[in-house]
UniProtKB/Swiss-Prot annotation:
Protein name: Peroxisomal membrane protein PMP27
Organism whose genome encodes this protein: Saccharomyces cerevisiae (strain ATCC 204508 / S288c) (Baker's yeast)
Bilayer topology term: Peripheral membrane protein
Main location group: membrane
Compartment(s) of residence: Peroxisome membrane
Entry similarity comment: Belongs to the peroxin-11 family.
Oligomer status and interactors: Homooligomer. Interacts with PEX34.
Keywords, ordered alphabetically: Membrane, Peroxisome, Peroxisome biogenesis
Gene: PEX11
Pfam families for this protein: PEX11
Cross-referenced InterPro entries: PEX11
Keyword Membrane: yes
Source organism phylogeny: Eukaryota, Fungi, Dikarya, Ascomycota, Saccharomycotina
Further facts: Present with 1630 molecules/cell in log phase SD medium.
GO BP annotations, alphabetical order: medium-chain fatty acid transport; peroxisome fission; peroxisome organization; regulation of peroxisome size; signal transduction
Amino acid sequence: MVCDTLVYHPSVTRFVKFLDGSAGREKVLRLLQYLARFLAVQNSSLLARQLQAQFTTVRKFLRFLKPLNHLQAAAKFYDNKLASDNVVRVCNVLKNIFFAAYLSLDQVNLLRILKVIPVTVLTGKKIPRWSNWCWLFGLLSGLAMDLRKIQTSHAQIAAFVKAKSQSQGDEHEDHKKVLGKAYQDRYTALRRLFWDAADSFIVLNNLGYLSSNEEYVALSGVVTSILGMQDMWKAT
């Protein structure tokens, strides 16, 4: 009876569904990768460092052909000529193109790790650096989009607050609902801004433009991994 209760519990069912797809597993492995990276520095653990490397490699397998998702998304955003905000549209196009390039170059890194291609200056140094640059440009496009959304939602809130104070009855309730949505949009944009900024902190350290403590870089990865898992959990 207890076993049945656990097996059929909604949370367990949701968790199984969360891990059923490669995207959910990749998010969990990303969290484990950065946790291992943090423990490797904190405890000078060789095992944690080895686990970090293994989690990183497995994630590369799970992201195989994922660039196609971003290319399709970029094409859809580009074709959406009726978008309400062209700044957001352009940022979405650029973000997905750069992420597609980043993930494509990362597949070369996987082939190098598997020793399918030889380790050369190109495959061992230049391509990993180009990959990080594409990741950074994708994040910068995301940051620009986040700031634009914050600006837009803030302007909407100011307008709705003014309209709400002058409305009555049913109209007042309608303005209240719209205002609530505007506040939610602003919160979502602020959350995404923090997320993209934390990931940018990681990649800037990867590129050598920052030389922060390894613990802080690892913790940034842990935080952004949790944010990604939260979004995926809500969508499950």
